[in-house]
Amino acid sequence: MNSSDEEKQLQLITSLKEQAIGEYEDLRAENQKTKEKCDKIRQERDEAVKKLEEFQKISHMVIEEVNFMQNHLEIEKTCRESAEALATKLNKENKTLKRISMLYMAKLGPDVITEEINIDDDDPATDTDAAAETCVSVQCQKQIKELRDQIVSVQEEKKVLAIELENLKSKLGEVMEEVNKVKQEKAVLNSEVLEQRKVLEKCNRVSMLAVEEYEELQVNLELEKDLRKKAESFAQEMFIEQNKLKRQSHLLLQSSLPDQQLLKALDENAKLIQQLEEERIQHQKKVKELEERLENEALHKEIHNLRQQLELLEDDKRELEQKYQSSEEKARNLKHSVDELQKRVNQSENSVPPPPPPPPPLPPPPPNPIRSLMSMIRKRSHPSGNSAKKEKTTQPETAEEVTDLKRQAVEEMMDRIKKGVHLRPVNQTARPKAKPDSLKGSESAVDELKGILGTLNKSTSSRSLKSLGPENSETELERILRRRKLTAEADSSSPTGILATSESKSMPVLGSVSSVTKSALNKKTLEAEFNNPCPLTPEPGEGPRKLEGCTNPKVTFQPPSKGGYRRKCVGSENQAEPVVVLDPVSTHEPQTKDQAAEKDPTQFEEEGGETQPEYKEDSGGKTGETDSSNC
């Protein structure tokens, strides 16, 4: 079985081998056939290429021959035309000759004419022969050559002209293209010019808007400058008021007044804080409005300028805040100084010995320097109402020196006010007129104050008079230095003088008036005078109101509480030194005379307007004088 299978397989393999060999031979034969066909096709292609090259050569030759023939035809045409032209010329010449000959024949006779006619009949044949002969002649050949040369030259010129014409056409096309380009560029330039005109119009509009906004900004800047000046003047007034508070702090010796003054200072600080907050809110509103305007603008320079203005305003705000902080610190210092002065007053009250009993006879009361000071101020403010109001008190020789001293001090203070020291105007309301009973009762305290000031030390008064003597001839700086030296010498003997001198040096020029009064009213003389008894005696013509059992009164000057200035003389059972208190502008409610009498029956009021009508701030020149009465 295996052998038979193997044989079958071998037979199959052999059969397949034979088939493969046969197929290979067939494929080989086909390959040879294709190669032969390819060779034939290559040969045909080469032959066709050769034929094409031959055809091209032949076509070029034919074209050259055609061109040559065309040229030859043109030459022949020109020759024919020239020959025809010559023939016409010859015919014309022959006709002219015939006419001439006819004339001669007419002269010769008819026989000759017949012969000539016969000759004319034979002329056409002879003409043709002559033409042939002429063409064959040397002249005709020369003319033909010349004509041919002319034809060649004319053809060359024609070619040159054709070339030039083509060049000119090409140049004309280029020129037309350039013209079209120039037209296009011109159109583009016109469009650009129109666009630039539109841009210029827009720029003009924007510049007009910018100029208007710049003018508005200038107006705002001027307003802000005015506000800044007002703020600076307000700060200067606040500084002057603080200096007033410093000067007044030297005379605060009661226990109840420091608390009130601190409350007033706190109220003023609260008002200042409110004003600063309102200004800050207004400033923020303005800044927001300016920012809203600037959001729609593209001008960075204006933004930069506005930012610089904002920085300046912020600097001003910082300065105001610093001044506010300095005012708070000064108020605190005033509080500390008030406490120290209160302690010293308590110590001095404990150390003061009991006063001796008053003597039965009383000298005539000396003049009141404060009243004279007030009368001088009233004379300057109301000169018309000064003639009907006079004082009825006598003036001894000792009192004249004190009045001269006070008068000179008042004149100096008024000179300083006139020279430009601006004081803050005090808001004074209409004050009620003083009643005769209250005036009579208050003049008893004034008489006591006159007695106190009349018995001052002569040495201090003479020294102050010497210092005030050359006032008109000396300069302001020399007077200030002399007063400070006098205050330093006068206050060096008392323990309380050190504080006064230290604070008086820190005050501005207005403090020079208070330094003069301090030099005349030092601590020792006041203690020596207040140790003496000073009962009160009413002036002639006064009411029955008296102060009994009052050994040492306390005189206080209170500011106008919506009713003007008031001066109170408060009698106390305890022995104490006199105190003069100049209180700043208070915010308390006004008290009537009945309410004041209910609170303290021994309290008398003397209004500052007893010898003059009510003060009204009608002009800016009177503000300094009313403030000087506060000092």
Curated annotation (Swiss-Prot):
Modified residues (Phosphothreonine): 487, 496, 537
Biased composition (Polar residues): 456-465, 490-505
Reported tissue expression: Expressed in hippocampal neurons.
Post-translational modification: Phosphorylated on Ser-101 and Ser-249 by PAK1 through a CDC42- and RAC1-dependent signaling pathway, which enhances its association with F-actin retrograde flow in filopodia and lamellipodia of axonal growth cones. Phosphorylation on Ser-101 and Ser-249 is increased by netrin-1.
Record key words, sorted: Acetylation, Cell projection, Coiled coil, Cytoplasm, Cytoskeleton, Developmental protein, Phosphoprotein
UniProt subcellular location: Perikaryon; Cell projection, Axon; Cell projection, Growth cone; Cytoplasm, Cytoskeleton
Gene Ontology biological process: actin filament bundle retrograde transport; axonogenesis; Cdc42 protein signal transduction; cytoplasmic actin-based contraction involved in cell motility; endoplasmic reticulum polarization; membrane depolarization; netrin-activated signaling pathway; neuron projection morphogenesis
InterPro entries (alphabetical): Shootin-1
Family the UniProt entry places it in: Belongs to the shootin family.
Protein name: Shootin-1
Protein's organism: Mus musculus
